[in-house]
């Protein structure tokens, strides 16, 4: 299981999600196989890999949900860069995992909802072609669990060269590197 968490942490690092990468690396050493949550994780009925059920992101999402719902406010330093040392982070995570065992078990039963606006860059670029060459608009339909924000691609501004999309977009500016 540890390799799945490490691999997902590597993916997060590669995409600039350093806080999530650090969280996942700490979780590698926090999940106790004897707890109810640990039993659920280590006996996952599907494929826990990042490319499949992505159990690491499910657990990371569950922890973030606990913070956002104010059920585990003590997690806040984890989401502020440099606010907590690794050893303290691990101790904090172990306490939160134990205290919110049942809630986290329920949370990981569902796939993570990532909705990364960065992924809209490809859709924005693709939508430009039919409009530019045929005067047609691209119509997007729900693509799956993570399609929500991507369906609003026409509200984003793509900052690539001269850019594409409304420049005064309050939604997002998608930077392409």
Language-model region placement:
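Short, hydrophobic/amphipathic alpha-helical patches that form generic packing surfaces
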Residues: 26-32, 57-69, 122-129
């Amino acid at each position: 299981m540890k390799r799945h968490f490490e691999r997902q942490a590597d993916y997060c690092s590669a995409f600039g999600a350093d806080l999530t990468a650090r969280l996942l690396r700490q979780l590698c050493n926090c999940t106790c196989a004897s707890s109810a949550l640990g039993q659920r994780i280590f006996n996952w009925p599907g494929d826990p890999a990042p490319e499949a059920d992505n159990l690491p992101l499910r657990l990371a999402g569950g922890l973030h949900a606990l913070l956002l719902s104010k059920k585990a406010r003590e997690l806040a330093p984890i989401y502020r860069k440099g606010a907590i040392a690794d050893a303290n982070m691990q101790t904090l995570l172990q306490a939160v995992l134990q205290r919110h065992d049942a809630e986290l078990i329920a949370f990981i039963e569902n796939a993570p909802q990532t909705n990364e606006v960065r992924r809209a860059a490809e859709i924005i670029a693709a939508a430009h072609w039919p409009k530019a060459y045929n005067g047609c608009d691209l119509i997007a339909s729900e693509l799956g669990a993570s399609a929500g924000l991507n369906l609003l691609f026409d509200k984003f501004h793509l900052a690539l060269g001269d850019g594409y999309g409304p420049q005064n977009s309050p939604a997002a500016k998608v930077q392409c590197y």
